[in-house]
Amino acid sequence: TEQYGDDTNNKLTKRISEQIESKGVIEVLRKGVKDRGNTFKLVYFKPKSGLNQEHQDLYKKNRFIELRQLKYSKKNENSIDMGIFINGIPVMMLELKNSLTGQDHTHGIKQWKFDRDSKEPLFKFKRNIVYFSVGNEKVFMSTRLSGPKTRFLPFNKGIDNPVNPKGHMTHYLWDELLQKDSVLDLIENFVHIRKDVEKVYDPKQQRLVEKKSETLIFPRYHQLNVIGKIKQDILDKGTGVNYLIQHTTGSGKSLSIGWLSHMLSSLYQNPTDSNRIFDTIIVVTDRRVLDKQIRGTILQLEQTKGVVNPVEGTSQQLREFLESGKSIIITTIQKFPVISETISKLGDRKFGVIIDEVHSSQSGETSKHLKKSLSKSNLDDYQEGENEDDLTQVDKMILDEINSRGKQPHISYFGFSGTPKNKTLELFGTPSEEGFKPFDLYSMKQS
């Protein structure tokens, strides 16, 4: 008020609007707004631990508002069925359709495509994090309105949603997603802007030019669901449990791995704990060159510099990362055989190891070293196979030794595979009366 006087509210509101216009609502809510040397935080996310009482108090003061029949234009009297606001800032828009009136989610999609002008200030790209079309039976979503070209994706529990004895099939949207903590969690840890650069041919310049694009990423239901399930299972059971995530092509696996790595790296058993459950999260790809998509996703989700550490150099760099306790390390499985000795010295720490395409990664001598390096006492030494023909024997020896030794209490494995083999199921799967099964399944039909 000293700088703006009586016009403080108007000036600050204008500044916030300008920042959302240029940077998008996600960045503004995460980082706040700077004006004349001051930073204004517009939301307080749920604290990871309960050690900071002031943060706890501020978090409880967040205001959530659901507005029905939200008018959005100066040009007409059109209205959105529902808008969700955090501290006065719009974040989600919903069209709600009832089968009793002969409508379903497809009618809402048509409204978004043909009746909602994407040039309206409220509908500009990055102004909201998601646009939902909600029927009694299905939910669809989009993150960017662009007229008839608007792309909607399903936000359903499966191909069809299961019957809900307590209400509509889509009531999970309200019970699970549209809750205060869930919305805050989405904004803080999931939604993000993916920046892509591709080379395209420009006929005017007669050469290849770089074309930049942005995509607002909002998680699908199966992605939010598996992260939440794993989180709760770890809180219930602790470390030393293996998880097989059977998500097929088209499931957004790189995103799921990225979200999982960040969730695990900031997970506390109790709000009052000062130490995280996992000391280090290691993301392992089965490629000699780091998977650019997985690496890029994890880096783009990074909000604090230095949390994510891709191993780009020698094994010495990986050794240093592990010894210094880096939060998230990204490497290839080929790096593990040369550092078995180094990792064995860190046996009192707790590790979460996320492995991409485990059905192939766990075959061969690299698997032996990986298991050997992340155990308190090394697996018994044995002669390594020197060529492809020896791998089957090595596989059997690995499985025999792992099974005889049992689970390692300080290490949890999270294996992603679209087509797991029986050995993969036995090693990573969840025991059941019918044998081993994946902890979570997203099938080809669903994708």
Show which residues each predicted segment covers.
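Structural recognition of the conserved hydrophobic beta-strand(s) that form the central parallel beta-sheet
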Residues: 132-133, 329-332, 411-417
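Cofactor-binding loop segments of dinucleotide-utilizing enzymes, especially the Rossmann-like FAD-
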Residues: 134-136, 285-287, 416-418
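Conserved helicase motor
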Residues: 285-288, 309-317, 333-338
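ATP-dependent helicase/translocase motor core
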Residues: 1-280, 289-305, 334, 343, ...
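Hydrophobic positions in the central parallel beta-sheet of the AAA+
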Residues: 283, 329-331, 353
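Extracellular/periplasmic catalytic domains that process cell-envelope and extracellular macromolecules
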Residues: 86, 322-325, 406-409
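Signature of the SF2 helicase/ATPase Hel1-core->accessory helical subdomain module
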Residues: 101-105, 143-144, 151-153, 337-447
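Conserved motor-coupling elements within RecA-like helicase/translocase cores
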Residues: 314-329, 345
